[in-house]
Amino acid sequence: IALNNADVNGTKVAPFANSRDFFYGSWFTTDEDWMGKFISSETRDPLPGILGYNNAVLMENSPNKTLACDGALNYINAYRTAVPVPASACEWFLPSLRELADLVDVVSTVNTKIAAAGGEELIENGGNGSRYWSSNERPGNSYVVYQHNLVSGGISTPYRSAGSTAGVFRMMLAF
């Protein structure tokens, strides 16, 4: 997990997108060159694994990216620019619900390690600052992208474009 939340022009809490009527995670199912190469981001309970990376690739290549996930991509790209990764790792990505859920039981331990490394602890104080955007979209509802609350362990389904349900972008990478 990244040592700090992503930041764009001094802002760390933001909406996922500027529009809410588009999906980014299923376009590949009808594209002959991409068909069968990914798992749809439109799922709440993904298979175990590093699906945040899968979902980030779907976002980056989506024909709807300027509407469906522009905010998220701005934060992903800003973090990638600001924080280089080791040659043995993939690029930074926005975690899936599963990857965020895996943090809930170990958040205190993770925070201790992050603090020791001089990073920004995962927020556990409630409010928008503890709602972390996932890279999972809600099936059948183009308005919604899932968030994970590290305080309650709960999952919420806010509108991707509503400022009142803005969340934090915390990146991960895999070796």
Feature locations, PLM:
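Extracellular adhesion/carbohydrate-recognition regions
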Residues: I1-A82, S130-Y132, A162-M172
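Conserved P-loop
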Residues: S88
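Mobile, glycine-rich extracellular loop/lid and propeptide segments
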Residues: E91
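C-terminal, surface-exposed recognition/capping segments
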Residues: L97-F175
